[in-house]
Amino acid sequence: CGLCHSVQGTELKMIEGGFPNADVKKGESLEFYHSVCPVFYYKDEKKHDIWGNIKKALIGYSSDKKIRFKAASGGALTEISCYLLENKKVDAIIHTTYDPNDPTKTISCISTTVEEVISRCGSRYGISVPLKDILQMVQSNKKYAFVGKPCDVMALRRYLNKDEKLTKSIIYLLYYLFDLFSSVFR
């Protein structure tokens, strides 16, 4: 997710398969990683035989057909993001989009309008590290919603317990289940 890079400056090195991995130096304290990284705390969650580690799962989709068919997995998170902006619950949405310099890559972005959210929505079939620059993206006088993968949200939620200032800025955490049921909503 890149949170260790944003908070601690940990270098992210590409490993086999093209995935970024924290390059933890020999002798470096693992306290931060153990307290925030999903790799270390998944074991504490209840595990369902089919779904894995869950607390609650809901199914839904956007009532706006334009969003439902353009966005990923029925557009529920895009619709919620638009609602949060339209109703001034947040100033911006932190999420991912394709890299305009290389559409095969994913980058983090901040959307402040419904139009931006909709233009940047859709499935990303590539690696993303949406928390890599989270501290640099957030302005303390603004309110945000963050949209990411379940592991990104888990890491960010645990970090927010340590950072009161960031907790006041990122007030909604939203995640999705990897296009699991998109054909049901079409």
Q: What annotation goes with each model-predicted range?
A:
Residues 24-27, 134:
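Short, flexible, glycine/charge-rich loop motifs used to bind or transfer phosphoryl groups or to couple energy/partner
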